Amino acid sequence: MSSGGLLLLLGLLTLWEVLTPVSSKDRPDFCELPADTGPCRVRFPSFYYNPDEKKCLEFIYGGCEGNANNFITKEECESTCAA
C-alpha cells in the first residue's frame, strides 16, 4: 500500500474513532457516580454525566475532593461518558 493510502486509512480510522459514541461497555465506571460538590465552598460551574438521563448536566463543584465524574466542559464530559 502506498504512503498516501496509509495516510488516508489513518485519517479515516481517526475520524471514525472521534465520531463513534462511547458505548456503555466502554464507559469508565466513574461516569456512574453521582455529582459530588465536595466539602469546599468555591463555586466552579462543572459538568457530570447523569446515567439515568444519559446526558451531561451542569452542577456546581466546590473546588476540592468530590469524585472523578466532574468535567470542566460539557464537551469533555460527553466525549468521556455520553453514549
From Swiss-Prot:
Expressed by the venom gland. Pfam families: Kunitz_BPTI (PF00014). The keyword Secreted applies. Coiled coil: none annotated. Could be used in a hydrogel with the procoagulant venom protein ecarin (AC Q90495) to greatly reduce bleeding. Was under preclinical trial by the Australian biopharmaceutical company QRxPharma Ltd, its subsidiary Venomics Pty Ltd (VPL) and the University of Queensland (UQ) under the name textilinin-1 (Q8008). Tested as a potent and selective plasmin inhibitor that has application as an antifibrinolytic agent to reduce blood loss associated with complex surgeries. It is being investigated as an alternative treatment to aprotinin (Trasylol). Disulfide bonds join C31-C81, C40-C64, C56-C77. Its main location: secreted. Residues 31-81 form the BPTI/Kunitz inhibitor domain. InterPro entries: Kunitz_BPTI, Kunitz_BPTI_sf, Prtase_inh_Kunz-CS, TFPI/VKTCI-like. It is found in: Secreted. PROSITE patterns: BPTI_KUNITZ_1, BPTI_KUNITZ_2. The record marks R41, V42 as: Reactive bond for trypsin. One of its GO terms (cellular component) is extracellular space. Keywords: Disulfide bond, Hemostasis impairing toxin, Pharmaceutical, Protease inhibitor, Secreted, Serine protease inhibitor, Signal, Toxin. GO terms for biological process: venom-mediated blood coagulation. Residues 1-24 form the signal peptide. One of its GO terms (molecular function) is serine-type endopeptidase inhibitor activity. PANTHER family: KUNITZ-TYPE PROTEASE INHIBITOR-RELATED, SERINE PEPTIDASE INHIBITOR, KUNITZ TYPE, 3. Negative results: has no effect on tissue plasminogen inhibitor (tPA/PLAT), urokinase, activated protein C (APC), elastase, factor Xa, alpha-factor XIIa, thrombin, and factor VIIa. Strongly inhibits plasmin (Ki=0.44 nM) and trypsin (Ki=0.42 nM). Has little effect on plasma (Ki=1870 nM) and tissue (Ki=12900 nM) kallikreins. Its plasmin-inhibiting activity makes it an antifibrinolytic agent. In vivo, reduces blood loss in a mouse tail vein bleeding model. Belongs to the venom Kunitz-type family. This is Kunitz-type serine protease inhibitor textilinin-1. It comes from Pseudonaja textilis textilis (Eastern brown snake).
